[in-house]
Amino acid sequence: MKKHGVLNSEIAAVLASLGHTDTVVIADCGLPIPDGVKRIDLAVEIGKPSFLEVLQVVADDMAIEKVTLAEEVIINNAEVNKEIERKLIEPAFEYVSHEQFKEHTKKAKAIIRTGEATPYANVILHAGVIF
């Protein structure tokens, strides 16, 4: 049994398989998940687990080069945006329209669905390298 890092076997396998620039999405419970993209559904009820809880665990276990967010989060969910910026200090940040964000999710290795039910609580994590 693992002692550290991500314990969820599906998430751990996805993170272990990532190459440089591959992407993983952490999403609220409302983001549409495109056909053909691996869905890892963690939602058990509204708000659980939260977007920020899942982001923290995944970010602690992943080399992240860049972060993509929907620009709408800045106004419509400023608190979550601030927390993302606080938790993820190193990577570059990119803001795109929500429609562009949804297009980008079609290329993700996986989308991790949380129980979060606040607007635009979604992030695309772009894998970096560990050296």
Swiss-Prot record:
Keywords: Carbohydrate metabolism, Cytoplasm, Isomerase. The active site is at H20 (proton donor). GO terms for cellular component: cytosol. It holds the Pfam family RbsD_FucU. GO terms for biological process: D-ribose catabolic process. One of its GO terms (molecular function) is D-ribose pyranase activity. Substrate binds at D28, H98, Y120, A121, N122. Its main location: cytoplasm. It is found in: Cytoplasm. Its EC number is 5.4.99.62. It comes from the Bacteria. Catalyzes the interconversion of beta-pyran and beta-furan forms of D-ribose. Homodecamer. This is D-ribose pyranase. It comes from Bacillus cereus (strain ATCC 14579 / DSM 31 / CCUG 7414 / JCM 2152 / NBRC 15305 / NCIMB 9373 / NCTC 2599 / NRRL B-3711).
